[in-house]
């Protein structure tokens, strides 16, 4: 099994953290892992993306042009990466701020309203964990226990008190991801 993922959005949305947590989770499952970040010079507000590859075989190259899954968090990333999803692949996105929704009919498209749900939870910083939860519902490639361990490894120890909140956010994302129908733009709860 090999899963090639691109996660893309604005800096400050937790794009790189989401990728790092997936990478740590894969390592804990004895998988081959690649984590390749890319970002502009801005600390926040610029675009950022990370390619994560999890595989039970050796990874020949971390550089990819097409992906099994794209997790899209802003319009610029939608414009850039929608066409990079392999036919039969998955595109997951937060519709907040998306003006031009995906149009491909040869991939499975899902929405998870991470921004709205994080606001409802009272902490916008868990946005990325909600989206990660949605991804894990659709592509359960790593065990939830390993994701929590990945959180512990990626969060500084002074923030470990936030792990229960992050776990709750992941669960909320798993419960709130919808299939997006390109033809009539309806979403169906999974």
Model regions and ranges:
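Active-site cofactor/cluster-binding pocket
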Residues: 1-190
